[in-house]
Amino acid sequence: MSNCVVLCSGGINSTVAAVHAARERDVHLLHIDFGQVAATAQRSAVHDIAQAIGCDTIDIDLPHLTAIAKLHRHANGPSGEHLDSTNQSTPKLTVASVPLLMAELLGIGIQTAIRMGAASVIIGSSEAASEAESEAGPGNGAAYLRQDYYYLFSRLVEMSVSAKNPVHLETPLIDFTRDEIVKIGSRFDTPFDLTYACKTDLGTHCGTCIDCAARHRAFNAAKLQDPAMAAAR
């Protein structure tokens, strides 16, 4: 059975991708803390998911990104700040707010796969979902979620990794909308109750942020109950 590394945030997409991969491969769930607000809750969810589907976890922290974010904050004022539980101002990071962050995350995934002897890196990105949810309309989804982004990154990997031990980048959900991904996950008995997709680090879904709203719409469109959101009420 071949090995694979799944970049996992603990959210729906990456969990569905992991469950699907675990049917035929040994899976390593990779969680990366790059300074995102929900990092602690995400990591806890990833560990719970790993235990449920029978795979191991790899945790990596990127403290240098917090330092970079502080430089950005000083240059642009308080708009990029939030107050943590100690009322101290800390950088608020997202994949969208840090240039080239997705490329860095993918690079870490590739490096991890090489060290683990894994043949592939899997990410649950969905261009279809990004396009559907873009406030600017069709054709204006996030560039780092587009299929051609991963195609170009794959070419870079091919040029950088030994041909004797290639590592392939897989995006199995790239063409599926969020509700379609929920339906796929349901067919594979995905432990949705363990997933976490919220902008906060509360450990339970706040129900009001944009990630919670997108999750709610997806389950409604799929005509399925969301066990994680139900538990948070």
Residue ranges and their predicted role:
Residues 1-189:
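ATP-dependent adenylation/nucleotidyltransferase module used to activate substrates
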Residues 103, 107, 196-217:
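Local cysteine-cluster metal-coordination motifs and their immediate loop/turn environment
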Residues 184-187, 192-202:
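Short, intrinsically disordered, charge-biased short linear motifs at domain edges
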Residues 116, 193, 207:
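Structured loop/turn residues at beta-strand edges in well-structured enzyme cores
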Residues 201-202, 222-233:
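Short cysteine/histidine-rich metal-coordination sites, predominantly Zn2+-binding motifs
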Residues 190, 216-221:
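A polyampholytic, Gly/Pro-enriched intrinsically disordered region
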